[in-house]
Amino acid sequence: MSAMGWTLLAAALLAISAQSNGCYIQNCPRGGKRAVETELHSCAACGLGGQCVGPSICCGGLLGGGRGGGCIVGGPLSAPCKRENLHPEPCRPGGGSSCGLEGICAAPGICCTDVTCSIDATCDDVTEKAGVTFSGATGGLANPTGDLLRKVLLLANADLE
């Protein structure tokens, strides 16, 4: 084989390997990368009856004053969520309905991704039936505690940006 043939072969192998999406040994799910969609489990419990939504986000339960739930970003109440992040299989928060670009409704009026939460009107109807246990029924953020939660959440997101 000529030098040009070896060069073309090397370039073809390089192009093929650049297009492949392998998973590293430490983060490959059981059953390989294609098994991810089928092996979802419920996310860990955290806080005061809440559920992990991301590596440092705990939502639901008695958070937010016990009136419809709320979310805590960071702190000791979300500590179990860091351990959940080390699980080889991904988890699916029980929030149910989608919101934003890639988020789920984690509490009434609150949309969370795995990194941050924001106020979202499409999540105002979130109740216990959606999957996350909230202590209130509907409209949980239409109260003084909920208003304070909204302000704290807006300030926290402003600090992150």
Curated annotation (Swiss-Prot):
Q: What is its main location?
A: secreted
Q: What is the annotated signal peptide range for this record?
A: 1-22
GO molecular function list: neurohypophyseal hormone activity
Asked if the Swiss-Prot or TrEMBL record annotates the protein with the keyword Disulfide bond, the reply is yes
Q: Which residues carry this modification: Glycine amide?
A: G31
Tell me where in or outside the cell this protein is found: Secreted
Does the record's keyword annotation contain Signal? yes
Spell out the InterPro entries in the cross-references.
Answer: Neurhyp_horm, Neurhyp_horm_dom_sf, Neurohypophysial_hormone_CS
Any transmembrane segments, and where? none
Give the UniProt keywords, A-Z: Amidation, Cleavage on pair of basic residues, Disulfide bond, Hormone, Secreted, Signal
Q: Which domain of life is it from?
A: Eukaryota
- According to the UniProt record, which cysteines are disulfide-bonded? C23-C28, C43-C91, C46-C58, C52-C81, C59-C71, C99-C111, C105-C123, C112-C117
What Gene Ontology terms describe where this protein resides (cellular component)?
Answer: extracellular space; secretory granule
* Functional summary from the UniProt entry: Vasotocin is an antidiuretic hormone.
What family does this chain come from, according to its entry? Belongs to the vasopressin/oxytocin family.
Return the PANTHER family for the record.
Answer: ISOTOCIN, NEUROPHYSIN
What protein name applies here? Answer: Vasotocin-neurophysin VT
Source organism per entry reads Eptatretus stoutii (Pacific hagfish)
